[in-house]
Amino acid sequence: MITEELKKLYIAHTGHEPEQIDELPSSGSNRRYFRLIGSPTLIGVSGESVEENRAFLYMAEHFRQKGLPVPQVFIRSEDDIYYLQEDLGDSLLFNAIEKGRKTSVFGEEEKQLLRKTIRLLPAVQFAGADGMDFSYCYPQAEFNSRSILWDLNYFKYCFLKATGMDFQEDRLEDDFQKMADVLLRSSSATFMYRDFQSRNVMIKDNEPWLIDFQGGRKGPVYYDVASFLWQAKANYPDSLRQELLKEYIDALRKYQPVDEAYFYAQLRHFVLFRTMQVLGAYGFRGYFEKKPHFIQSVPFAIENLRQLLQEPYPEYPYLCRILRELTELKQFTDDLQKRRLVVKVTSFAYKKGIPEDSTGNGGGFVFDCRAVNNPGKYAVSYTHLRAHETEADLV
């Protein structure tokens, strides 16, 4: 049924049938994507929500008129359930930075793609908002108290309660309201992409292109920065995150003055909020819909939460207490231990025999260090040093 409808659109647009139609993998949404191979090759989309489809179709045309890199939509069905758009290829930014994500060591090419992407964001937020009719946005036209509390309760019901934790709902709701008040201090008329992260950026000709922006609305600039730089599985080291923040602020100054102290102070509240929002999504898509990608992302988001809570949020005392307890649950601490690489360095004397392999796998490395003097034989004393100290590297 879906492929037949997409084929009709393809024929109406090109005058001939596609050579082949292949369904593409989907992730979090209920939209289905197909590649219609032919001359030209196009992407066909089938979406169950007409309102969401219309939001995308309107925004795609609006952004193209503003010169932003988004796929062109060529034809749509009369009921707006199906449409054909430009094929941007298969290269997601998420995949392009795979080596860095897995090692936390990002090469220069990966960093350059990230710089280009984060510097593009202010253009989306400001130029994208210029002349936009926000009434097309779905399900909300703007970032407001109602949408904030929706997301916080999404976290509460789809993730927090799913862990079996006990908590006082009235005290938690009090802190939710405080958070909404803090986040709304930063109201603005800019476009908030809402899900600006490396899975929603494609790389074509070494340049970033934007997809999946149909959930966008009017809102503050901080949310998208938090979404991108604190994406759970992106695994950006803090040094790279700070570098990209500077790139963003530099690009932002083209559109408005920036008080950096206020910017950073406000951003950390959005980072906490976004982390809770994605945990809610991971809970629903992973625990309830059983989608493996979302289940696999939970430990990374929990680790983000651990790092965030190292600095206090005095505005939300009860919420932070519950979040700390959440990060200490056995199911998350056990998973953290599984993901940590443990390297043990020991020494032994051959005259006592080869030591027992405690791992049971027979692996490892043995280095013959008999020609190396013991540090204790040097005139300079090294007894005050420990392995984590820089000077100890010289031994």
PLM region descriptions:
Residues M1-T14:
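Juxta-kinase regulatory segment immediately upstream of eukaryotic protein kinase catalytic domains
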Residues N30-L36, V124, M179-Y223, N235:
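Active-site acidic catalytic loop and adjacent metal/ATP-binding pocket
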Residues I37-E142, I148-L149:
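ATP-binding pocket architecture of kinase catalytic cores
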Residues R54, L93-K116, D133-Y193, K204, ...:
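ATP-dependent phospho-/nucleotidyl transfer catalytic cores
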Residues N153-A162, V221-P257, L272-F288, A301-L308:
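Active-site activation/catalytic loop segments of kinase-like enzymes and analogous catalytic loops
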Residues G280-L336:
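ATP/Mg2+ or Mg2+-diphosphate-binding catalytic cores
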Residues R339-S381:
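Glycine-rich, flexible N-terminal cofactor/catalytic loop recognition
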Residues T383-T390:
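Conserved small/polar residues in nucleotide/adenosyl-binding loops
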